[in-house]
Amino acid sequence: MAFYAAYHQDGRNKASHFIGVPMIILSLFIPLAWLRFDIGGVPVTAAMIFAGVVLAYYFVLDVPLALAMLAVNALLIWAGHQIAGLGAAQGWAWFAVFFVGGWIIQLVGHAFEGRKPALADNLFQIFVAPIFLAAEVFFALGYKPALHEAVQRRAQLSRAQSAESSTSLPRTSSRSGASGSRSA
């Protein structure tokens, strides 16, 4: 979580993710709701299976946060199924609105942050985003203050190391290659 937090320190960026991340999740649940199966006589959709796998990971990390994510996912799955029930044309249109809109909102947030999205460096961070947002709410309510402090400390250290490594790289002038001369 500290890796993800290092990319999300600006309040405006965090706020954008509270809007954008659920929009993207909802968008994915729409086409996944069209894939229906019977497992032991129980009708399920690919949206339910996908959410179940991700939630299993969250339960390994933290049970109270996973329970919160279970509630959020249940609402998003329900909404995804409702939209999917409108038919393919409307479903795909809403998918596009939520998916593209969610990414645009997050990218605006990252412009405020002045940093690229975490998933640009580690694709797995796409699964961390939802539980990170749940943790932010829980931390604001006083949940596990020691964990919150440790995450923030590691995030700040990661940002400092990233800034240090980016400033320690040799810089080249755009003119140095054109003139053929080298400065000492």
Please name every model-derived segment.
Residues M1-P22, L28-P31, V54-P64, F112, ...:
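Membrane interfacial helix-start motif at the N-side
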Residues L26-F29, I49-Y57, N73-G80:
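Hydrophobic, membrane-inserted alpha-helices
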Residues D62-L67, A89-W92, L119:
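Membrane-helix interface segments
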Residues G52-L65, M69, Q82, F98-R115, ...:
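Transmembrane alpha-helical segments that form the membrane-embedded catalytic/substrate-channel core
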Residues P170-A184:
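Long, low-complexity, intrinsically disordered segments
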Residues A2-Y7, A111-P170:
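Membrane-proximal soluble regions of multi-pass membrane proteins
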Residues A33-I49, W92-V97:
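Structural signature of hydrophobic alpha-helical transmembrane segments
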Residues A66-L75, D121-L123:
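Cytoplasmic-side transmembrane-helix entry/capping segments in multi-pass membrane proteins
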